């Protein structure tokens, strides 16, 4: 599984996505793919309407073909070491390539969950 995490991190570093406007306490992120195409979105999980497309176009060099080997990792880290940072709260995998409307609805639902830092 660690190889899958490292491969994804390497792939994402191979092109410069647009940065988020400002740091957030809770981040919602989506990675969507189909043949020859990759979309990455992120937004503030406490603010409706903040979902931003960071990349929507061709896959990075070396990842043009969808090779589906390996494990699926949802979370922070992947090798059970204590060196990861952050916290992972929820994850989901779906089939197909979701519409803009579906992505916005998911974002609104996450915001409605009311993630907050306690006192």
Q: What feature does the model see in each segment?
A:
Residues 1-119:
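Extracellular glycan-associated modules
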